[in-house]
Amino acid sequence: MIETLTNFFITSALVLFGIAFIIGLFRLIKGPTTADRVVAFDASSAVIMCIIGIVSVIYNTVSFLDSIMLVAIISFVSSVSISRFIGGGRVFNGTNKRNH
């Protein structure tokens, strides 16, 4: 009984996260502004991390946790880079001094 409920909830979570990913992907492609695309990319990468976590639970392994960490790092670095580009127009300024 409990295993049936667990399978139902895991399957439902995968379906709902899949729908959320499709919606985020649509906003990523169709977003009118760059800020919309950045938010959609962050949301999509969070959904991907959740899907990988659920797949890790299904297969009863911790091997997928490294890929969750990799997706999180790539998402963070890309969000910071795009935010700096939107804010000032340059991602790297070529000097070691910070502008305060």
Swiss-Prot record:
<keyword id="KW-1133">Transmembrane helix</keyword>
<comment type="subunit">
    <text>May form a heterooligomeric complex that consists of seven subunits: mnhA2, mnhB2, mnhC2, mnhD2, mnhE2, mnhF2 and mnhG2.</text>
</comment>
<feature type="transmembrane region" description="Helical">
    <location>
        <begin position="62"/>
        <end position="82"/>
    </location>
</feature>
<comment type="similarity">
    <text>Belongs to the CPA3 antiporters (TC 2.A.63) subunit F family.</text>
</comment>
<dbReference type="InterPro" id="IPR007208">
    <property type="entry name" value="MrpF/PhaF-like"/>
</dbReference>
<feature type="transmembrane region" description="Helical">
    <location>
        <begin position="6"/>
        <end position="26"/>
    </location>
</feature>
<dbReference type="GO" id="GO:0005886">
    <property type="term" value="C:plasma membrane"/>
</dbReference>
<keyword id="KW-1003">Cell membrane</keyword>
<dbReference type="Pfam" id="PF04066">
    <property type="entry name" value="MrpF_PhaF"/>
</dbReference>
<keyword id="KW-0050">Antiport</keyword>
<keyword id="KW-0812">Transmembrane</keyword>
<keyword id="KW-0406">Ion transport</keyword>
<feature type="transmembrane region" description="Helical">
    <location>
        <begin position="38"/>
        <end position="58"/>
    </location>
</feature>
<keyword id="KW-0472">Membrane</keyword>
<protein>
    <recommendedName>
        <fullName>Putative antiporter subunit mnhF2</fullName>
    </recommendedName>
</protein>
<dbReference type="GO" id="GO:0015385">
    <property type="term" value="F:sodium:proton antiporter activity"/>
</dbReference>
<keyword id="KW-0813">Transport</keyword>
